[in-house]
């Protein structure tokens, strides 16, 4: 289910496969966006995981974050300009995601919306589960 937006080296692709596998093992109801926790299931494990997943990926690769306002969706823009979205699969059908905003880490972890979404706690929980999963 690897979602690469531009070509990259085989070693980087392999690392992304490892990360994707660890993320899939790490996602859970508690790491999902609060209003989506009741709908979260193992059938759609990426549901509500975009922000915290993008933060974990940022821990390993750096870069910035892309945000689509229509779907309130966040994914990574790596330092080389490659866009990487490990949670794209949560959307059913042909959903077009355009970059409406470029964010930095502070934009995501601070502020009223981060507090309402309990972003820091969910991120720390996912980061802990991700470490245990072995990535």
Where are these regions (language model features)?
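A structural boundary/capping signal
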Residues: 1-135
């Amino acid at each position: 289910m690897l979602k690469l937006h531009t070509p990259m080296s085989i070693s980087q692709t392999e690392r992304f496969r490892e990360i994707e596998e660890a993320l899939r093992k790490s996602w859970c109801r508690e790491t999902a966006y609060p209003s989506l926790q009741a709908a979260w299931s193992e059938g759609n494990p990426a549901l509500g995981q975009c922000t915290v997943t993008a933060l974990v990926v940022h821990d390993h690769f750096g870069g910035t974050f892309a945000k689509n306002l229509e779907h309130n969706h966040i994914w990574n823009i790596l330092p080389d300009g490659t866009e990487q979205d490990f949670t794209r699969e949560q959307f059913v059908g042909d959903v077009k995601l355009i970059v409406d905003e470029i964010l930095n880490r502070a934009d995501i972890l601070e502020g009223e919306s981060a507090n309402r979404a309990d972003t820091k706690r969910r991120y720390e929980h996912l980061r802990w589960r991700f470490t245990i999963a072995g990535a």
